[in-house]
Design a protein with these regions (language model features):
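Short, charged low-complexity linear segments at domain edges
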Residues: 378-419
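Helicase motor core with emphasis on the C-terminal RecA-like subdomain
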Residues: 2-3, 7-16, 20-24, 28-50, ...
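Accessory DNA-binding and partner-docking regions appended to nucleic-acid-acting proteins
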Residues: 1-9, 356, 367-372, 384, ...
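Flexible coil/turn residues that form the inter-helical turn or adjacent wing/linker of helix-turn-helix
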Residues: 176, 240, 397, 463, ...
């Protein structure tokens, strides 16, 4: 791409979005698209994927189609682009037939630069006819088709949607093939290859910016259901001034936890919302809008909430239950800290979570109805594989960040996350320093004898049992089930009587995770021998585990790590003295007033970072105003006078007070 084209891209970025430079990876994606090349961008949530197709769409003649899976994303992106001075549109089922006709009519007239559409609509006859007309000679032109959440096309991913398989057919039906750009935040190498093949990308420029979100703290704690509810309540109270999301695996849990939190937090003024697929469309839309508009501080939701929610100031995401995969967890947790400021991601789990997940897997998914028997069986097996990786995350005593980075194939970042101090080795490394495992003191314990006992017992049993029953037998339990099945006669019964059932069960889990034992699929998995079972009989066999030395000390260190990150951010970004803090709150109030009047989210007017920039620079002219990062020419023209007047009034008041 020519230097002049690159400068035009930077000018477009500044005019519409208020930035003077692209983030890492954005420039390469924009360059590839403007050079006429297909592109695949794998960029973490908050890295600015939308900029990669919005900037070219604002530069290229014609209309860019953006394929998006959710109505909320279409509507929010359209509002944000309108606020920035662009000409976007969307076409989905929330519009009446008359409104859809109007949108298509205006599109034919060349009034729009972008159009957001759902994958299900692409082959709908009326839309397809419009798209083919636009892409034909003499039409308005279709220079680019951008595909968001592209991992949905892959059956290897955690969120396969059959409608995404229509995208390639749609593109191939156009008279002139457009540039095709696909974007995702979560994709292993296998999923990336699937995306390229299923979408028909031609020699794409592939940009993988890495998966490490350094501003996020990751915590993982095992606890009972009652302890979870108390933990969430206490955490939300301690962070009452912040926006957060609490994810639950079922609608029932969402309703129960949201009700409990609302009752407990109501007196403190913290508003709690709930969101799941069992609610009506209007109720979900209203709740989502209230959260985006900062009228609700805490959203308790199933995974039906969040995809496409572009709310930058979410300070924490708590998973009250285990998600179905590492991909799902990374994507949902990644909704925290999109503004780049420190944020926290906490996973609370117990064995019941995995039993529920296995039940949900066996029950099947609505998307499975479009699959044949062979595909359905494969999908079931794949979901169990993904859940197994999630179980490994919960049980690891290593760095949580490293576990996820290695899962996604980001080896360089994983090595960096656990890099040793100068002069040390990898074994000496203290890890990333920003996850609960790295901030926990562990003791290494040799449990070779226990491991041998467990594997040998499983090897002698012709009938397979679950972890709990095996642990009971090895402990020497006197339960009715053990007596009825005569398991108290087994060789190995009571051989680990000095250990607790929970301890034995944990060792069995570790043996499964390392391949000495293995669990079957299904809601009630049983334990069998793993591929490495024979190794336990080797004289050199050794099996060690790590045990937490002090949970209390670990929790204190974890809190301190997040506090340090936030203190660093405050030094650079937040109002530092009393009058700056007062001005910040006044500008927030003005932003809320403007956004309410214009029916848009507050961050679509100016972001929190932009408000902090206004507090520091206190601009008095338009030229000074557009020096604030995140305030472009379009927004300066739309909102600048009101904010500069508020700053001038504030300074006048303080000048009088100081006189």
């Amino acid at each position: 791409m020519t230097d002049s084209m690159q400068q035009m891209a930077l000018d477009t970025l500044g005019a519409y979005f208020g930035y003077t430079s692209f983030r890492p990876g954005q420039d390469r994606m924009v360059d590839a698209i403007l050079a006429g090349r297909d592109a695949l961008g794998v960029m973490p949530t908050g890295a600015g994927k939308s900029i990669c197709y919005q900037v070219p769409a604002l530069m290229l003649p014609g209309i860019t189609f953006v394929v998006s899976p959710l109505l909320s994303l279409m509507e929010d992106q359209t509002r944000a682009l309108l606020a920035a001075g662009a000409r976007p549109s969307y076409l989905n089922s929330s519009l009446t037939p008359a409104q859809q006709n109007t949108v298509l009519k205006r599109a034919r007239e060349g009034r729009y630069q972008l159009m957001y559409v759902a994958p299900e609509r692409l082959l709908e006859p009326r839309f397809l006819a419009f798209a083919q007309e636009a892409a034909a000679d003499g039409g308005i032109g279709v220079p680019l088709v951008a595909i968001d959440e592209a991992h949905c096309v892959s059956q290897w991913g955690q969120d396969f949607r059959p409608a995404y398989l229509q995208i390639r057919e749609f593109i191939e039906s156009l008279p002139q093939r457009p540039i095709v750009a696909a974007f995702t935040a979560t994709a292993t190498e296998r999923v990336r290859a699937d995306i390229q093949q299923m979408l028909g990308l031609q020699n794409p420029a592939t940009v993988v910016t890495g998966f490490d979100r350094k501003n996020l703290y990751f915590g993982c704690e095992e606890m009972g259901d009652k302890a979870k509810a108390a933990w969430v309540r206490d955490y939300v109270i301690a962070h009452s001034g912040e926006s957060g999301i609490v994810y639950c695996s079922t609608r029932k849990t969402v309703d129960a936890l949201a009700g409990e939190l609302a009752e407990a937090l109501g007196p403190s003024g913290i508003r709690v919302g709930r969101y799941h697929a069992g609610m009506g469309n209007d109720a979900r839309r209203q709740t989502q809008r209230a959260f985006i508009d900062d009228d609700i501080q805490v959203m308790v939701a199933t995974n039906a909430f969040g995809m496409g929610i572009d709310k930058p100031n979410v300070r924490y995401v708590i998973h009250n239950n285990v998600p179905e995969s590492i991909e799902a967890y990374y994507q949902e947790a990644g909704r925290a800290g999109r503004d780049g400021d420190p944020a926290s991601c906490h996973l609370l789990w117990n064995g019941n979570d995995f039993r529920m997940r296995r039940f949900l897997i066996d029950r099947g998914d609505a998307a499975d109805e479009a699959l044949d028997d062979e595909q359905r069986a494969w999908a079931l097996q794949n979901r169990y594989r993904l859940l197994s990786q999630m179980e490994g995350y919960c049980n690891t005593t290593g760095c949580l960040r490293e576990y996820m980075l290695r899962y996604f194939g980001d080896e360089a970042a994983a090595e960096h996350a656990v890099a040793a101090a100068a002069g040390g080795t990898a074994d000496d490394a203290e890890g990333c320093g920003n996850c609960s495992n790295c901030l926990t003191q562990f003791e290494v314990e040799d449990v070779t004898d226990m491991a041998r006992v467990a594997v040998r017992y499983v090897a002698t049993r012709p009938m397979r049992f679950g972890k709990s029953l095996i642990a009971d037998v090895l402990h020497g339990g006197n339960t009715e089930r053990i007596r009825q099945m005569h398991l108290d006669q087994d060789r190995g019964y009571g051989e680990l009587s000095s250990e607790s059932v929970g301890r034995i069960k944990d060792i069995i889990g570790q043996l499964c995770g390392r391949g000495y034992l293995a669990t079957s699929q299904g809601q009630y998995p049983v334990v069998g021998l793993g591929p490495r079972a024979a190794e336990v009989e080797d004289e050199a066999f050794a099996f060690t585990v790590k045990r937490r030395a002090s949970k209390r000390k670990a929790s204190a260190r974890a809190r301190r790590a997040v506090d340090l990150l936030r203190e660093e951010a405050e030094l650079d970004q937040r109002p530092r003295v009393g009058d700056d803090a007062e001005l910040f709150e006044r500008l927030r109030a003005l932003r809320k007033e403007i956004s309410t009047e214009l029916e848009m989210a507050p961050y679509m007017v100016f972001s929190d970072k932009a408000l902090r920039g206004l507090c520091r620079l206190r601009p008095q002219t338009r030229d000074e105003l557009i020096q604030v990062n995140g305030i472009g020419e379009k927004k300066a023209d739309a909102f600048g006078e009101q904010f500069m007047s508020a700053i001038e009034e504030f300074e006048s008041e303080h000048a009088r007070d100081g006189a």
